[in-house]
């Protein structure tokens, strides 16, 4: 530790404070006597004064951004997050008895991932890999990245002699393109699940008039489909088409497919045609780690994932690769990530990934994953009881894909209605849609609500809210007199209309319900305080935290 910094420590007043984001901030003051004692030069003191902004809290430095974050925190706390690709950040409860009494409490009491992601590690540049960096001063970063890689392999029970992993990708999309770059050449052929059938943009999506993503711009793409009627992947047709198309790469993975994958069958198709098999398990990686979904690792050559969905880490990506597949596979993957597709890694994010992976290996995480699936199945059951059409007639994972076309509604209209009443869903294409811009369904994901300690009984309430939202949408569409989206919005925005009155009541009911449940990462909630009281954790909450969840004007 530098002598100057060491001399300052006794004179720095450190006051941990919890802001709306529960981030620790420091209030720094320098004793003038230190300067008189010669421990601080006049230039050093002047520099500290000039850099005062570096020690301000967010609220002090930028009230405008702080207000936006405050409003967003209220939105999440007072609403129901049903976006399938969103999941609250993970938390681990220290007392073992809490895990025993309530297995989902690991989501509520620690800010470990957020703290790692907002740490000093963001300051360090570290292009390259551990032991082979292009910058100095990376001894601690090397330890961190090696730890993260070890935890990634352990989380999925992988043998380090067989599997390797790159933890540097900035996102799942970057991970996918880097994996493509490592495995195949430009204009080689790929096959992935079509976007309207539940696939992902990065798996080669294009339209009749335009190649939409880099994966279709730089590679030749021929999507496979689900079977009309059942919504299940048509493995028979995939077998036939792959035999004709001879892809160099087959991608198995989805963003809106509510069933599990037959990796063994896909392996056979890939081997028959000399194809690599890549699994993009971004949506289900947490469920795979918990043993609640089939594992792609037994059959696939490369496995990619995001880290922020059911794995519940920060926003980033991972690439797993079989080292025994080809002798240069590890080198190809690592070089595809850097320098081919990105620059220096985000070390703060890697730290957050490491924390999340440790938590994913905890037995409590398995209970969380089981509950996610149970909650999704409860939503599906209740919606089906109202005779709504669900893709594949149910779910085996964390999401439900709801087909609204039989009702004469679009996903866009339900998304608009739900936004107004603090329910967040996303419009989504369903099998048979002719345009991704006007999708006929919505995707409902249950990872985030499970992280808020909701179980099957609460899912019945949530499903009832969704049912009411659809009925209000039908009323608004009738009031609009046509099916134009702008007139639909105008109808439920008119306070004299029945749809507006029903919507206002639904909004109140949703807020009243949602604010009974803690929001992971934000301990300053009445629900969070009540949980602490219930379990008699001896913490002086009144002095440790100041409740700062505020209801913004207009809500």
Task: Describe every region a protein language model picked out.
Residues 147-387, 408:
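Conserved PLP-enzyme active-site core in the AAT-like
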Residues 1-49:
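N-terminal mitochondrial targeting presequence
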Residues 44-132, 461:
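N-terminal "arm"/small-domain region of PLP-dependent enzymes with the aminotransferase-like
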Residues 72-79, 123-131, 247, 330-335, ...:
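Short acidic (Asp/Glu) and glycine-rich catalytic loops that position anionic groups and cofactors
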Residues 74, 87, 122, 126, ...:
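Conserved internal helical-beta-strand scaffold that buttresses enzyme catalytic cores
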Residues 389-457, 527-534:
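Conserved PLP-binding catalytic core of the aspartate aminotransferase-like
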Residues 99-104, 130, 162-163, 343-347, ...:
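Flexible, glycine/charged-enriched surface loops at secondary-structure junctions
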Residues 3, 8, 48-50, 57-63, ...:
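PLP-dependent enzyme catalytic core of the Aspartate aminotransferase-like
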């Amino acid at each position: 530790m530098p002598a100057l910094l060491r001399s300052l420590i006794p004179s720095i007043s450190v006051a941990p404070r919890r802001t709306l984001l529960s981030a620790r901030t420091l209030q720094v003051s320098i004793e003038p006597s230190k300067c008189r004692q010669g421990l601080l030069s006049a230039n050093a003191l002047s520099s500290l004064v000039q850099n005062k902004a570096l020690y301000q809290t967010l609220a002090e430095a930028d009230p405008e951004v702080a207000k936006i974050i405050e409003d967003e925190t209220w939105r999440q706390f007072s609403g129901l997050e049903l976006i399938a690709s969103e999941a609250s950040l993970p938390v681990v409860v220290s007392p073992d008895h809490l895990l025993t009494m309530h297995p989902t409490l690991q989501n509520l009491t620690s800010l470990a991932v957020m703290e790692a992601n907002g740490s000093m590690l963001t300051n360090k540049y570290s292009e390259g890999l551990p032991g082979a960096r292009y910058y100095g001063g990376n001894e601690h970063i090397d330890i961190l990245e090696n730890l993260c890689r070890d935890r990634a392999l352990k989380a999925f029970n992988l043998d380090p002699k067989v599997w390797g992993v790159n933890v540097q990708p900035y996102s799942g999309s970057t991970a996918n393109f880097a994996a493509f770059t490592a495995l195949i050449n430009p204009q080689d052929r790929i096959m992935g699940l079509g976007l309207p059938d539940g696939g992902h943009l990065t798996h080669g999506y294009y339209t009749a008039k335009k190649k939409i993503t880099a994966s279709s711009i730089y590679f030749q793409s021929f999507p496979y489909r689900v079977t009309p009627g059942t919504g299940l992947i048509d493995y028979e047709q995939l077998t036939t088409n792959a035999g004709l198309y001879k892809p160099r790469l087959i991608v198995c993975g989805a963003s809106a497919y509510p069933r599990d994958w037959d990796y063994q069958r896909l392996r056979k198709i890939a081997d028959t045609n000399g194809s690599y098999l890549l699994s993009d398990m971004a949506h289900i990686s947490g469920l795979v780690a918990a043993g609640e979904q089939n594992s792609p690792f037994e059959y696939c050559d490369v496995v990619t994932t995001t880290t922020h969905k059911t794995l519940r880490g920060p926003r980033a990506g991972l690439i797993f690769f079989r080292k025994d597949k080809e002798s240069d596979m590890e080198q190809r993957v690592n070089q595809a990530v850097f320098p081919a597709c990105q620059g220096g890694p985000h070390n703060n994010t890697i730290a957050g990934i490491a924390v999340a992976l440790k938590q994913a290996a905890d037995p409590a995480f398995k209970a969380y994953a089981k509950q996610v699936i149970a909650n999704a199945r409860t939503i599906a059951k209740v919606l089906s009881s109202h005779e709504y059409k669900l893709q594949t007639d149910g779910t085996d994972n964390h999401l439900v894909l709801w087909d609204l076309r039989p009702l004469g509604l679009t996903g866009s209209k339900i998304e608009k209605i739900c936004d107004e009443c603090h329910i967040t869903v996303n419009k989504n294409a369903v099998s048979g849609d002719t345009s991704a811009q006007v999708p006929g369904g919505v995707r409902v994901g249950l990872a985030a609500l499970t992280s808020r300690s909701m179980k099957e009984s609460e899912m019945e309430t949530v499903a009832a809210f969704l049912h009411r939202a659809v009925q209000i949408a039908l009323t608004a569409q009738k009031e609009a007199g046509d099916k134009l989206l702008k007139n639909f919005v105008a109808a439920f925005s008119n306070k004299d209309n029945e749809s507006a009155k029903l919507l206002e009541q639904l909004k109140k009911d949703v807020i009243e319900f949602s604010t009974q449940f803690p929001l992971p990462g934000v301990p300053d909630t009445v629900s969070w305080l009540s949980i602490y009281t219930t379990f008699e954790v001896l913490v002086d909450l009144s002095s440790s935290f100041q409740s700062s969840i505020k209801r913004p004007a207009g809500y």
